[in-house]
C-alpha cells in the first residue's frame, strides 16, 4: 500500500495490528489520522508503517494516540454519576460483605478524568476508604498523563468551584488533583482488542462496577459483542456495567 491520501485498507490493517477494530463510520477518520502520522514521520509507504508497528514502540504509541478518542472531562455524563451516587453505590454497599472493599474499574480511562471523578464522588459520599478504583487504557501516553493528575480549565468545565477548591491546587491556569485522591486510583495498560479477560492473575475480575463509556461506540459490532461479554464476565455477582454515553 502506497500513501497517496487516506487508505481504508491500510487503516484496517494498522488497526488490526494494534488490536483495534473500528466501525465503518469511523474508518475514514482513522485512515486520515494514520495518513497524518505517516506524513509527520516521513513514512512514504503503508508497508513500511506496518513493518515498524510493534517493534517501534514510539511509532506504535503515535498511531494509537492518533486513532483513539481521548477527549474527556471530569464528571462527563453527569446523569450517570448521579445514578452511581443515588442508586448503584447504595445497592452495592447493602450487599457488600463486611470488610470487603467495593471494586470499581474505569475501562478506556484516557487521561484519568473518569476514575478521578469517581474518586471525588466516593470521597464526597464518605465512602472512599472502602472503595478500590482501577483504571485502564490502551494508550501508555494517556496513562502517563493521567498519573500526573494535572489538567487544564477545559477538563474541569463540569466541575464546580467548591469541588475545585477542595480537591485541586491551581497554578497558572492548570489544576493538580490532590495527592490523596491520586493515590486512590491504580492505572494499568489494557488493550481490549488483544488482552484476555477476565484475568484474575492481574486482579482484573470480580468488579462491582465497571464503566466502559465512549469506547464501544467506535468499534465494529462483532468487537462490541465480544468485549461486552468479557466485561460482563469481569463483574462480581450483582455487579453493574455502564457503557454509555
Please name every model-derived segment:
Residues 237-245:
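Conserved beta-strand signature within the Rossmann-like core of class I S-adenosyl-L-methionine
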Residues 98-117, 131-134:
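Conserved class I S-adenosyl-L-methionine
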Residues 1-105:
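Conserved AdoMet
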Amino acid at each position: 500500500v502506497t500513501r497517496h491520501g487516506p487508505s481504508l485498507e491500510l487503516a484496517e490493517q494498522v488497526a488490526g495490528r494494534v488490536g483495534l477494530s473500528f466501525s465503518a463510520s469511523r474508518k475514514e477518520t482513522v485512515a486520515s489520522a494514520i495518513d497524518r502520522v505517516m506524513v509527520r514521520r516521513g513514512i512514504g509507504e503503508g508497508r513500511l508503517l506496518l513493518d515498524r508497528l510493534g517493534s517501534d514502540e514510539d511509532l506504535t504509541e503515535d498511531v494509537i494516540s492518533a486513532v483513539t478518542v481521548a477527549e474527556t472531562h471530569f464528571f462527563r455524563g453527569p446523569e450517570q454519576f448521579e445514578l452511581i451516587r443515588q442508586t448503584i453505590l447504595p445497592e452495592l454497599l447493602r450487599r457488600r460483605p463486611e470488610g470487603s472493599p467495593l471494586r470499581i474499574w474505569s475501562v478506556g480511562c484516557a487521561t484519568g478524568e473518569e476514575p478521578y471523578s469517581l474518586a471525588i464522588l466516593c470521597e464526597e459520599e464518605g465512602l472512599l476508604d472502602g472503595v478500590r478504583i482501577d483504571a485502564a487504557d490502551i494508550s501508555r501516553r494517556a496513562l502517563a498523563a493521567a498519573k500526573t493528575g494535572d489538567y487544564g480549565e477545559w477538563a474541569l468545565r463540569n466541575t464546580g468551584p467548591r469541588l475545585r477548591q477542595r480537591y485541586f491546587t491551581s497554578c497558572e491556569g492548570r489544576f493538580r488533583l490532590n495527592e490523596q485522591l491520586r493515590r486512590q486510583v491504580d492505572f494499568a495498560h489494557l488493550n481490549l482488542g488483544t488482552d484476555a479477560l477476565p484475568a484474575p492473575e492481574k486482579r482484573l475480575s470480580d468488579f462491582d462496577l465497571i464503566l466502559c463509556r465512549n469506547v464501544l461506540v467506535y468499534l465494529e459490532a462483532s468487537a462490541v459483542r465480544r468485549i461486552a461479554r468479557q466485561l460482563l464476565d469481569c463483574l462480581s455477582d450483582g455487579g453493574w456495567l455502564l457503557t454509555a454515553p
